């Protein structure tokens, strides 16, 4: 897996780990992370196909974040994940920061990765994102949903 990923241009670091939380539990989860020393740096309701309320948390000044995702509707992919997980929250995806989402998308498509999005699209915080299927390649499946994130603040 690492052999192939080194050919994806611009992967910089783990941007965030996303955790699905059940409806009505977002604020309790935020308080739990705040008790560990995290602080909320961003909140947003993401409509469209995602249908989530998010809280983005940071500890110190590090670049690695925790993203808590609460579904807004029964059709939200996050709600479907919770349902699949027996009604419990848990790991939703791992996101990597890339310097150029379009280049990373093209490289991963050329290498045969199964991409969920047809093209990079707008994410929260003004980012550009795309998702890679957990079972993207039979011989090197990730086993978890992967998100690639380009942040305009990096430009």
What are these regions (language model features)?
Residues 15, 50, 75, 83, ...:
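Acidic-enriched, low-complexity/disordered segments with a strong bias for Aspartate over Glutamate
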Residues 1-10, 21-36, 40, 45, 53-58, 60, 65-69, 73-135, ...:
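Vicinal oxygen chelate
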Residues 15, 55, 92:
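Residue-level detector of short, conserved catalytic/binding motifs and their immediate flanks
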Residues 1-52:
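Long, hydrophobic N-terminal alpha-helical segment
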